[in-house]
UniProtKB/Swiss-Prot annotation:
[4Fe-4S] cluster binds at C304, C307, C350, E357. Keywords: 4Fe-4S, Iron, Iron-sulfur, Isoprene biosynthesis, Metal-binding, Oxidoreductase. It comes from the Bacteria. InterPro entries: Dihydropteroate_synth-like_sf, IspG_bac, IspG_bac-typ, NO2/SO3_Rdtase_4Fe4S_sf. This is 4-hydroxy-3-methylbut-2-en-1-yl diphosphate synthase (flavodoxin). The keyword Metal-binding applies. PANTHER family: 4-HYDROXY-3-METHYLBUT-2-EN-1-YL DIPHOSPHATE SYNTHASE, 4-HYDROXY-3-METHYLBUT-2-EN-1-YL DIPHOSPHATE SYNTHASE (FERREDOXIN), CHLOROPLASTIC. It holds the Pfam family GcpE. Belongs to the IspG family. The gene is ispG. Binds 1 [4Fe-4S] cluster. The keyword Cell wall biogenesis/degradation does not apply.
Length: 417
């Protein structure tokens, strides 16, 4: 018979720590949140603005496209501008096809980047492949930069895929084409990592990723990678899609492998709405890690979904206002109120679960449901502290939350000084 502990997260997989511009990935460090810009990197103003927005939202690493000379020339200027803004955010260069040439022709770019991303599927073709891969690895060694060897099923090494398909056809019990593709993805990453080490790049400068667009494929390839190596792993479901579909798919896939102790850094690859907010992917990544109990970024607001007992929208509006206010203030509060990210607030809509849920929170309120007495008990640290009445219940509770934060977490700030 299973015990309660059988369902806890599996221990984190042991991986080699990699220092990416001062941010540690792997080696037991907290799972790192990262994101990527969608600006033209040569447009310095727009790229700086988007990197800054992603960084403020909580992205600890930011990847930028380096696809031509103009982009490469812009990288050190982008880095300098960010530093002038007080943002020491590690920038990752995303290279495809001509990365070896861009790094060689633009040494200031090679120096300014914190990490290089290489795709084994398009770093070079035929007899040029290993040579051009080696040139990038040699640049990483020269500038003491880590690399991410990022395999993507959409640009998979066709020579390796063909070879494994041929071997599979000759096997007595052949695998499905999908299974062979998974194996090819994993082998491509491991073969490339071995080659990088042979050239002289140490394992503590290598991160691996294996991007696919289907949930079950992601679970399979990362489970396979985790069994066959101890490299730090970058998780991400490529082409996850837009809106709720992209969020659900990314959460289902990465949630499973994270629960099994696999993964050292994550990116949620959401397709934004036209002119949409790019920082949404950062928020989703943070929320995924937080709801699973792996990290804490922003205070949690628990709120009931509502039912026939809660025909008023007051509790919904209050929960939304408090959540928005907490998130908006976190850039300042993170330094002003150490530990505030662990705060739990409950905003409940009626008497059924309201008092009980509120007692479990640090501070909670149980608003009156339909037909209930127009009074709202407030619970602080598990004890009923007061009852709010009248037309200003919502604003009164917001003031109580602010006061609670100041009294509880402001003391930590004073003690630290």
């Amino acid at each position: 018979m299973s015990s309660a502990t059988d369902f806890d997260p599996k221990p984190r997989r042991s991986s080699v720590a990699v220092d990416v511009g001062g941010v540690i990935v792997g080696g037991g460090a907290p799972v790192v949140v990262q994101s990527m810009t969608n600006t033209d990197t040569a447009d310095i103003d727009s790229t700086v603005a988007q990197v800054a927005a992603l960084f403020k939202a909580g992205s600890e690493l930011v990847r930028i496209t380096v696809d031509r000379d103009e982009s490469a020339a812009a990288v050190p200027k982008i880095r300098e501008r960010l530093l002038r803004l007080g943002m020491d955010v590690p920038l990752i260069g995303d290279f495809h096809y001509i990365g070896h040439k861009l790094l060689a022709d633009h040494p200031a770019c090679a120096e300014a980047l914190a990490k290089y991303r290489i795709n084994p599927g398009n770093v070079g073709f035929k007899d040029k492949k290993d040579k051009q891969f080696a040139e990038i690895i040699e640049m990483a060694i020269r500038y003491d930069k880590p690399v991410r060897i990022g395999v993507n099923w959409g640009s998979l090494d066709q020579d390796l895929l063909t070879a494994l398909m041929d071997q599979n056809s000759a096997a007595g019990s052949p695998l499905s084409a999908r299974q062979v593709t998974r194996e090819t993805i994993v082998q491509s990453a491991l073969i490339s990592a071995d080659l990088a080490e042979e050239i002289g790049l140490p394992r503590n400068r290598i991160i691996l990723s294996a991007k696919v667009s289907q949930v079950q494929d992601l679970i399979a390839v990362y489970s396979m990678l985790s069994e066959r190596s101890n490299h730090a792993l970058h998780l991400g479901l490529t082409e996850a899609g837009m809106g709720s579909k992209g969020i659900v798919a990314s959460s289902a896939a990465m949630g499973y492998v994270l629960q099994h102790g696999i993964g050292d850094t994550v990116r949620v690859s959401l397709t934004p709405e036209p002119n949409g907010d790019r920082t949404r992917e950062v928020q989703v990544a943070q929320e995924l890690l937080q709801v699973m109990g792996f990290r804490q970024f922003v205070p949690v607001v628990a709120a009931c979904p509502g039912c026939g007992r809660t025909t008023s929208t007051v509790f919904q509006e209050l929960a939304q206002n408090i959540q928005n206010d907490l998130r908006k203030n976190m850039p300042v509060w993170r330094d002003k109120y150490p530990g505030v990210e662990a705060l739990n607030v409950a905003v409940m809509g009626c008497i059924v679960n309201g008092p009980g849920e509120s007692k479990h929170a640090d501070i909670g309120i149980s608003l009156p449901g339909t037909g209930e007495s127009p009074a709202a008990p407030v619970f602080i640290d598990g004890q009923k502290a007061m009852t709010l009445r009248g037309p200003n219940i919502a604003s009164d509770f917001e003031a109580l939350v602010a006061d609670y934060i100041e009294k509880r977490f402001g003391q930590k700030s004073v003690a630290a000084e």
